[in-house]
């Protein structure tokens, strides 16, 4: 799917990340992909992002759209043209925007499900809840800005985690065609993340023991980005 370059502001982006048994994660992604591993574990999670002033690059800010969005994703690698590629596989997108819901998968990449979002935030704290209109997905997260990752994280430092996720700028989302994924690449003017000290985290998808049996998944850490100028560039579809 091709679309013009889209630009705007990432007002707030939370990456809530889980460490997952690699075999359990492989069962949840298309066979063409392999989990990208960190110390032998797959890394998956929810991207919770507030986008503002989203519009084609040639258009003024005043026409831009604002929305809250959630994407369930996993870091993956795959082979193409004899080379190893990396990105994220996005199994589901949810949005507060009716426009995103109607046009996603048709005019721009990725099907988007309608959802309601409740957000309370300050400079140092945030609490966010998301419930999909189809009642299939629920996400909660609450926390405050921290100085470092939890000591239990699979990443040895904030810099290591930042580099891992910066490499996942190319995302492939499910469509109504089970053999085709829509591609979209994020380009940021700067890449800067801060750790969050989490007091509550829940994802109905990642807490589903029919998908991830007990002992195969644990919450690892969360990161936040704020006030980032960015662009979205379409990428070639990927057939699985």
What are these regions (language model features)?
Residues 19-34, 69-87:
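N-terminal short leaders/motifs
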Residues 42, 49-80:
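Long, hydrophobic/aromatic-enriched structural stretches that serve as scaffold segments
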Residues 1-56, 191-207, 218, 224, ...:
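N-terminal domain-onset segments
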Residues 11-13, 73-240:
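Internal, well-folded beta-alpha domain core
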